[in-house]
Amino acid sequence: MKNKAKIIMGIVIALVFVAAVGAILFKKFAPSYTQRTMEEQYKDLAKDETLICLDGFPLEEKGKIIGDTMYLPLDTVIDKMNERFYWDKKEQVLSFVSPVRGLMTVAPNTTTYTVGKENKEMTDQILYVDGDTMYISVPFYDEMTQEKSTLKWASKGEAPNRVILNADFESTHMEAKLSEKTRLRVGPNKKYDYLLELKKDQKVIVDTQSQAENDYQKVFTTDGIEGYVPAEFLSGQTETAWKRQSEEETFTQKGIGTTVCLGWHQMTQTVGAAELESKVAVAGSLNVVSPTWFALNDNKGNFSSLASEEYVTAAHAKGLKVWGLINDFDKNISLKRILGRTSTRSRLINNLVSTAMRYKLDGINIDFEGIAQEAGYAYVQFMRELSILCRKSGIVLS
């Protein structure tokens, strides 16, 4: 009887030992079956914030949710999404130039924006100011840049709040399909909790900036969720670029239909036909003359003029095009101030084009040689806006 009891006790102990070892091995090798909620995973994202997923990857910067509208930080939009937005902090005006639609402007705290001289309405406030940060509404951003960027979708109320968009259609990223169904885990190991069930053949974006760890690779789903999957399940990895949903608008300019042979005509006073005759007599194949008629003379967008209608008539009679030149040689002016402010930039552009039209000039030649780095952003905006008006008026811009 005692021997039987010992045998039974031995069996029990053995079973307990096997069970304990099994439990240890299961705990060591079995995957986590716990699904982490999106709310828990993105608990650091405030209720009024939204993730921004740009070209397949999340940004550090966050968007805002005001009422029912999602907003993007304007600085982020300009730096990383579309450089054609220009923010005039001094005069509180946002400008956007479209080669097709022209110049569009909007001020903070309004639902109205201007296209040329026409006012248009958006449903929600376009620009929102939060402390030192300016935000632009996602609907307005999409309205302005649909040919330059692609808004895939914006999700409000579905954790995590996020905006998915593309802006870079030149660089490539790595895409892959899953060879097996799997789980998207929060860390590089099967012991980590999982976020999503992923299907076989589901497309993911591979984070090529990070190395595989524990045979798990960091990936992003196409709707912006970050996690890890077994590296062996990533099949058909292909470098590809994002595709535009529409053709990109391009800035085109009027030409003269042939090779330009240009000569500058330096002037310090108004001259007429006789002076032109003496200068072009030995000019050979010259077909464009650029008299140095205009000079910026203050910080309000005004300029001096030596323009002569007689000179233009004489040049045209000789088959020459006339491109009036404007310079920035006055040491007392500031290009950053002139071009950086919406009002002075607009005054300069409108006066240049109206003067060119009045004297029947064929073109305008910009000779700004004092462009400091701090004025570069404003100068590019100036040229964009000027090019639109020149093209509309049939004037060459050089």
Regions found by a protein language model. Give the residues of each.
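Short, solvent-exposed loop/turn elements at domain surfaces
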Residues: 185-187, 269-275, 297-300
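SH3/SH3-like beta-barrel fold
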Residues: 96, 201, 215-222, 229
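Chitinase-like catalytic core of GlcNAc-active glycosidases
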Residues: 257-266, 283, 295-398
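Boundary/entry segment of secreted carbohydrate-active catalytic domains
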Residues: 181, 225, 230-277
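Primary recognition of N-terminal secretory signal peptides and signal-anchoring hydrophobic helices
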Residues: 2-210, 243-251, 255-256
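Distinct, well-ordered alpha-helical segments
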Residues: 271-279, 336, 379
